């Protein structure tokens, strides 16, 4: 079931890329996923590189699962690093379990902080680029951490996706955004 489902999604991504590039080869083909790869197999998506073998890291990965990574099909890939623990050190202190929207059960480990997520994504993407995403409303109660997550995503990923601007506008978080971008080397 895991292989069949993932193969169908990867086959669809290949077909969609072909159609997009046939219409206009200059258009970037891309996607968004959550960053929680250890449980993303539950929704049938293998956004890793075809050169990464998840069977070496995860007991759920079948021997053929590695054949259906689709990272090489993408020109643009954004992922949701939607974590309030920013550093690995901070995560290890809180050791909190995370229950993402697509998860059947709570997850834990260094995947579930921004720094750890970026580190693990670099490993599974095998040189394919990714843009780290943030969820602004997670930081209403601690705006300084908004600056930290922006900085970490800019330093450890290949860009920044902000979800979404309405939260920055409504809570007037421009100062925190500017600080994070400066500290992340983008301003």
Task: Name every feature range the model reports, one short phrase each.
Residues 1-141:
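Glycoside hydrolase catalytic-domain groove-lining segments
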Residues 141-159, 163-187:
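Aromatic-rich peripheral "rim/lid" segments of glycoside hydrolase catalytic domains that contact
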């Amino acid at each position: 079931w895991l292989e069949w489902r993932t193969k169908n999604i990867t086959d669809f991504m290949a077909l969609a890329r072909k159609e997009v590039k046939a219409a206009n080869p200059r258009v970037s083909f891309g996607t968004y996923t959550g960053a929680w790869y250890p449980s993303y197999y539950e929704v049938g998506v293998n956004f890793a590189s075809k050169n990464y073998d998840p069977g070496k890291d995860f007991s759920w990965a079948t021997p053929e699962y590695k054949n259906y990574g689709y990272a090489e099909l993408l020109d643009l890939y954004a992922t949701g690093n939607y974590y309030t623990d920013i550093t690995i050190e901070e995560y290890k202190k809180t050791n909190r379990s995370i229950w993402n929207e697509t998860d059947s059960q709570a997850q834990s480990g260094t995947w579930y902080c921004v720094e750890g997520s970026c580190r693990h994504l670099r490993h599974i993407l095998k040189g394919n680029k990714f843009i780290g995403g943030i969820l602004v409303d997670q930081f209403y109660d601690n705006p300084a951490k908004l600056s930290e997550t922006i900085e970490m995503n800019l330093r450890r990923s290949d860009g920044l996706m902000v979800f979404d601007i309405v939260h920055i506008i409504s809570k007037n978080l421009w100062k925190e955004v500017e600080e994070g971008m400066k500290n992340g080397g983008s301003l």
